[in-house]
Curated annotation (Swiss-Prot):
One function term, GO molecular function aspect: glycolipid transfer activity
GO BP annotation list: lipopolysaccharide transport
Pfam families xrefs: LptD_N (PF03968)
Family annotation (InterPro entries): LPS_export_LptA, OstA-like_N
GO terms under cellular component: cell outer membrane; outer membrane-bounded periplasmic space
UniProt key word Protein biosynthesis: no
Keyword Signal: yes
Keyword annotations of the record: Signal
UniProt name for this protein: Uncharacterized protein R00383
Gene3D superfamilies, per the entry: Lipopolysaccharide (LPS) transport protein A like domain
Length: 186
């Protein structure tokens, strides 16, 4: 099946939201509590997005596109990697092959890695819900880092439109390691 560039652009724009979710990763403010306001989502409409995978399967009747094996999405300094990624689009909102799909959510699984600049996040799976503007990253161990500052929990919830974020420990305790050298001096 051939995929039109416009279709890939629409998928890419949605994937940029997933990949750029990494820019929401831990700031020093998160050290004050497990619930905090994080940096805002910054999308770039003028940078190209590159998507690679071992396989792409488009299932228009099921309103989804499945990327399988070594999935990598890159835009500027932002990278999303996962073993698998499924893009769900709204029924009746157009098809991926026609280039006018209305993306509902993106699910990634099998060793998820998000990176934006000096910030990184890892987990076992994640969901970017474009309808309610949320990102959820889950795993036995979700690790957020920026330089030598490290935050560990099992689930990260981010409200993209407000920047509110919460890192849960899932029955254990949230772990935070801060490097005093990372503080900004005035």
């Amino acid at each position: 099946m051939s995929v039109k560039p416009a279709a890939l652009f629409r998928i890419s724009a949605a994937l940029a939201v997933a990949g750029l979710g990494a820019s929401l990763i831990a700031s020093a403010a998160l050290a004050q509590a497990t619930s905090s306001r994080m940096q805002g989502l910054q999308l770039s409409n003028d940078q190209p997005i590159q998507i690679e995978s071992d396989k792409l399967e488009i299932k228009d009747p099921e309103s989804k596109a499945i990327f399988t094996g070594n999935v990598k999405v890159v835009q500027g300094t932002t990278t999303l990697q996962a073993g698998n990624m499924t893009v769900f689009y709204k029924a009746g909102g157009g098809s991926v092959t026609s280039g006018n799909a209305d993306i509902d959510r993106i699910e990634v699984s099998n060793k998820v890695f998000l990176s934006s600049g000096a910030q990184q996040a890892t987990g076992e799976s994640g969901i970017v819900n474009l309808t309610n503007q949320t990102i959820v990253l889950k795993g036995k161990k979700v690790v957020l880092s920026e330089g030598k500052n490290v935050f560990v929990g099992c689930q990260l919830n981010v409200q993209m439109d407000t920047g509110e974020a919460q890192l849960d420990a899932c029955g254990g305790r949230v772990q935070i390691q801060l490097d005093p050298q990372s503080r900004k001096t005035n």
